Amino acid sequence: MTDTVNTRRLALDVLLEVTEHGAYSNQVLRAVLEKYQYMEKYERAFLTRLVEGTIQHMIELDYVIDQFSKVKVKKMKPVIRNILRMGVYQICLLYTSPSPRDS
């Protein structure tokens, strides 16, 4: 079985569970990694780094987003807010991408 999965979408789902529903990131992330065991090792590592890094740097990421957005982070829809957080984290703090096909 060669199912393809969008790791960024999975990261977004984890972040939404954590930020909007108060779930524990390690538990949600573990459940996702168990569900998608067929993912390549580099994809699993990227997913973990993206989720953990975005959560770890959330205050700084929100500050950067607020500097460039007309809409303040706190007023954004949760999906938009977390997509922007992940994007800023990748651009500013994460130096590698898992694969060109996951862009």
Each language-model region and where it sits:
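N-terminal interaction/assembly modules
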Residues: 1-72, 79, 88-91
